[in-house]
Design a protein with these regions (language model features):
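Conserved non-cysteine loop/helix-boundary elements of the Radical SAM core domain that shape
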Residues: 1-25, 33-54, 70-82
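Active-site C-terminal subdomain of aminotransferase-like
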Residues: 30
Length: 168
């Protein structure tokens, strides 16, 4: 499915670059975006490819249809339950990796968003590339309401705006 989305480079180019990074001693943080018209098999293939790359962290993004972009009118099949299943599949296929719920989680998970925190290790807050995300205070309240604790202080976290979660 990758060639129908990315036209500037091939999937093999991406894999080669990630392997070079891993061989240089870098930990791989590589995930994907769902909701672009991919099949269930495409999602499984993505997670299988990430297994081969030994990704340490997998950010899972959910497409936010932005007006004026090629994906604005895409007919996605992302329901809150489907998004949870995708996150659960990531967890099952990558039990030792850090699974990160990234862009679009608020938009697609809606009222089921807190359930995702039982699957993932971290969430992105305060904005994404094209859209604003859930604010820090609202995310912290959700985390606290569930009885989780922040594993990394937000003010000391790296600039990519994620907070790691640790169960109480």
């Amino acid at each position: 499915y990758y060639p129908s989305i990315c036209t500037t480079h091939g999937f093999a180019d991406r894999v080669r670059n990630l392997k070079i990074c891993r061989e240089a001693g870098l930990e791989i943080c590589s995930g994907g975006i769902v909701g672009q018209g991919e099949s269930d098999e495409d999602i499984v293939d993505m997670f299988l490819a990430l297994q081969e790359l030994e990704a340490k962290a997998l950010p899972i993004n959910f497409l936010i249809p932005v007006e004026g972009t090629p994906f604005a009118a895409i007919k996605h099949r992302l329901t809150p339950l489907r998004c949870l299943k995708i996150l659960a599949l990531a967890r099952l296929m990558h039990p030792a990796a850090e699974i990160r719920a990234a862009a679009g989680r608020e938009y697609h998970l809606r009222s089921l968003q807190p359930m995702a925190l039982f699957i993932v290790d971290s969430i992105f807050v305060n904005g994404y590339l094209t859209e604003s995300g859930q604010g820090r205070d609202e995310a912290l309240q959700m985390i606290d309401d569930l009885g989780f604790e922040i594993g990394i202080e937000y003010s000391r976290a790296s600039t990519d705006g994620f907070a790691c979660l640790v169960t109480a």
